[in-house]
């Protein structure tokens, strides 16, 4: 039988792996792992192929373990060196942090405990005890300051109220003096509900005696005709003196002779000033009684001195400025100055009252009667 071929164990110079190759005459061989060609330098074992392969496995395992151990040792040495180099710096940095952290935690613990105690006790009795003592100490100055504040309030109120009190006293004195004295005619007209009763004694002091006698005669009739007086009060404005009321009362003096003349004089004023009734209805009401006045009274003429107030107050001041024909007709048709009969005078008055209408100026209304 032929002898088995011998093999040798070789190691690559590049990858440092153990391999089994057959023995040859040439000294060159190629690595099975990396494929590099190299020459024979050293044989790590010789034998059969099977024995060489087992030996190669053992060598590779040992080499791997050694390489791992070397790597571990290198890593450990590097880590040890790093720890030796960085250790003191890290220890110096870590020591203050470790010292600060427990201090912070300790303070937080105390604060948390205090907050819990405050929440349970409702504001903390121990904390409130100190400010309570502090507030109790300044109590006496506050107590002494209270009367000072009251005195100051009184001092401030007294000078303010002083002039008012004096004014009120003066007002009381003036009221008492005014009660003793007769009232002014304007005051009496504003304060009295009936102008006819309260104005007479006030005006009697200022007017001549002849006029006061006539007014005294009309005072009793003014009480009887309360409705007519109320109508005249409505005609008089509140802020002005009662001049129109006086004129109406002077007109009411002729009631002794004409009977219903006051009713005739007061009626034509109400529709003109109030504007409630139409002018035609007023004309119809004026025409009937004024046509009867000459039959009932039987008067022909009246003196111009007594009828002068009628002409002054019957036409309103507004229509005079607006109606241009009123003053001309009042001057031309004035029956009391020329001596025309009473019927013509009443017709002229009705024509004057109709021409005062702003919307019907320039027309002749004599044919309607």
Curated annotation (Swiss-Prot):
Region (Necessary for the association with the MRN complex): 223-259
GO biological process: DNA damage response; DNA repair; mitotic G2 DNA damage checkpoint signaling; positive regulation of double-strand break repair via homologous recombination; positive regulation of protein kinase activity; protein localization to chromatin; regulation of double-strand break repair via nonhomologous end joining; response to ionizing radiation
UniProt superkingdom: Eukaryota
Record InterPro entries: MRNIP, MRNIP_N
Record's GO cellular component terms: nucleoplasm; nucleus
One Pfam family hit: MRNIP
Protein's UniProt keywords contain Translocase: no
Residue(s) carrying Phosphoserine: 115
Segments carrying motif Nuclear localization signal (NLS): 148-151
Basic and acidic residues composition bias: residue spans: 221-230
Region (Disordered) residue spans: 122-150, 209-245, 282-317
Molecular function as annotated in GO: chromatin binding
Keywords: DNA damage, DNA repair, Nucleus, Phosphoprotein
Cell compartment(s), UniProt: Nucleus; Nucleus, Nucleoplasm
PTM: Phosphorylated; phosphorylation is constitutive and occurs in the absence of any DNA-damaging stimulus. Phosphorylation on Ser-115 is necessary for its nuclear retention.
Complex formation: Associates with the MRE11-RAD50-NBN (MRN) damage-sensing complex; this association is constitutive. Interacts with MRE11. Interacts with NBN. Interacts with RAD50.
Protein purpose: Plays a role in the cellular response to DNA damage and the maintenance of genome stability through its association with the MRN damage-sensing complex. Promotes chromatin loading and activity of the MRN complex to facilitate subsequent ATM-mediated DNA damage response signaling and DNA repair.
Similarity annotation: Belongs to the MRNIP family.
Record protein name field: MRN complex-interacting protein
Lineage of the organism: Eukaryota, Metazoa, Chordata, Craniata, Vertebrata
Gene assigned in the entry: MRNIP
